[in-house]
Every structure is written in structure tokens, then in C-alpha cells.
Curated annotation (Swiss-Prot):
Keywords: Disulfide bond, Knottin, Secreted, Toxin. The cysteine framework is VI/VII (C-C-CC-C-C). One of its GO terms (molecular function) is toxin activity. This is Conotoxin pc6b. Disulfide bonds join C2-C20, C9-C25, C19-C29. Expressed by the venom duct. InterPro entries: Conotoxin_omega-typ_CS (IPR012321). Belongs to the conotoxin O1 superfamily. It is found in: Secreted. Transmembrane segments: none annotated. GO terms for cellular component: extracellular region.
Amino acid sequence: TCLEIGEFCGKPMMVGSLCCSPGWCFFICVG
């Protein structure tokens, strides 16, 4: 789950917005 910009993510987050990809988040997303 991505909560803030710059947080590392291991897998894509498509909840709310396309904010996370296999790497780093660029947008704040909720989910």
C-alpha cells in the first residue's frame, strides 16, 4: 500500500490512481 510520495513499492498499486509501479511511488494513493 502506498501512503506517500517516494515510498518504495514492491508491486503495482492500482487502487484509486496509477500511483505505484514496481519501484517507487509518484503519487499519493489510497488503498
